[in-house]
């Protein structure tokens, strides 16, 4: 029987070997547990049209599963809204929460492959932090990920990506994500 060594994601290795030390020097943390890290990444795809056609949710679930490597949770309406012809319990979106190695691999693919493939991309807005170091942004189409076959797309779907960090301020979160390779616009 051969023993195989578990390979760490390359972004996680870079964080442990380089980024942690530079953040500790930059902000002068006394304790290594104060150094901010990425806690989780939540990828959400809202499909409002699924209220009228329930088959649309399957395409979104399949796309999210291909992109993240994890089966999405189908989100249902919490209450009925007559103007949107929406009833309580109808499927209206899909969500995936990534943690651990899958999270690091997704962030690596996002920063090195997906974001550079966006047409007319000038960088991410540095103003979309929530006040405690978490970052939220949206992608207009799922085809920027190389896992999605462009010829098999039935409809263009966007998604929201929330990067949750253990940072306590926006400056710490911005420094962490910039070190991880997020291309922020310069003001």
Curated annotation (Swiss-Prot):
InterPro entries (UniProt xref): Ribosomal_uL5 (IPR002132), Ribosomal_uL5_bac-type (IPR020930), Ribosomal_uL5_C (IPR031309), Ribosomal_uL5_dom_sf (IPR022803), Ribosomal_uL5_N (IPR031310)
Keywords for the protein's UniProt record, in alphabetical order: Ribonucleoprotein, Ribosomal protein, RNA-binding, rRNA-binding, tRNA-binding
Keyword tRNA-binding: yes
GO CC annotations on file: ribonucleoprotein complex; ribosome
Gene Ontology annotations of biological process type: translation
A molecular function GO annotation: rRNA binding
UniProt superkingdom: Bacteria
Key word RNA-binding present: yes
Signal sequence coordinates: none
Family in the record: Belongs to the universal ribosomal protein uL5 family.
Function: This is one of the proteins that bind and probably mediate the attachment of the 5S RNA into the large ribosomal subunit, where it forms part of the central protuberance. In the 70S ribosome it contacts protein S13 of the 30S subunit (bridge B1b), connecting the 2 subunits; this bridge is implicated in subunit movement. Contacts the P site tRNA; the 5S rRNA and some of its associated proteins might help stabilize positioning of ribosome-bound tRNAs.
HAMAP family per UniProt: Ribosomal_uL5_B (MF_01333_B)
Subunit structure, interactors included: Part of the 50S ribosomal subunit; part of the 5S rRNA/L5/L18/L25 subcomplex. Contacts the 5S rRNA and the P site tRNA. Forms a bridge to the 30S subunit in the 70S ribosome.
Name recorded for this polypeptide: Large ribosomal subunit protein uL5
